[in-house]
Amino acid sequence: MKVALIAPLTQGAGPSVVGASLRNAVDMAVNETGPGDITVLVKDDHGTADGARAAAQAAVSEGAELILGPLFASSVREVGRVAKAANRPAIAFSTDASVASRGVYLLSFLVESYVDRIVEFAAQKGKKSIAVLAPENDYGNVAVGEMQSVAARTGIRVMAIERYRPGASQDAVKRISQVAGQIDALFIPDQAESMNVVGKQLTTAGVDPKKVQILGTGLWNDARALNVPALQGAWFAAPENAGFNAFAARYRTKYNSDPTRIATLAFDATTLAIALARSQGPARYSEGVLTNPSGFNGADGVFRFKPDGLNERGLSVLQIGAGSTTVISPAPRSFAGGPT
């Protein structure tokens, strides 16, 4: 049987590091699980929506039963149209939840999952009131919307939501400081490289991280966040690093280079495709099999697909301190019923 990988193997005039990492991860999965079950058709979408559409059409015409990828949201939309017309499912790698749909599943690390985990954990730890300091970008928009939903569900009061243009956070920080005495948590869904500046501004404005628990997302699973003074003691949600570190060590041995962080998505998608081919017979890539509520185990932990194409992941909560992270709430190892 055949599955297809659609990835940006080339972009512009040259090869793509990300695309090469995804392709290598697919090869690793095939080699580690043993040959003979599937043939992977590798298709280059050139990082464009048109290229992705053409790649999907070629994959379907060559007999692919399942499409893995692509990476970019615009490409996922085009692949989804082709795949649905051919009654083929796709497991894509975009972080844009809007491109998920029935039959087009996202394996990526979604903002929504990070927000759900960290805000629910804060509520479990007795946090009652929260403020939000978020960049005015797509990531911030999704994070704020999801935080409001989780806060309503868990009973946390949202005392303030302040937005800022990336690189221009000072005024928003000042406004947050005015409610610092009324909150016990501050959620900042911004990237690690921004936090040195934002952190200094919070300190200058008098926001004490010893009194206000700082919360973040998997964007802080980055060395640049670990030595920011204002983030010492901060909590954030992310996959546990052990699985990726083990994968990366094997990858380095085989390819003499480091994988991109998202390489495990291609590895897990391929491993899943092979496992289902071996265990599920003709129904291997049906909706009922792919949306098994018990989920599946991958390099980054347990995950499952929802019928709407989104995913749920077992995430840990980590605390920053002294240039490293400590797991303070381990990722669940299974969903109800246990993973496949």
State each model region's role.
Residues 1-340:
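Extracytosolic ligand-binding ectodomains
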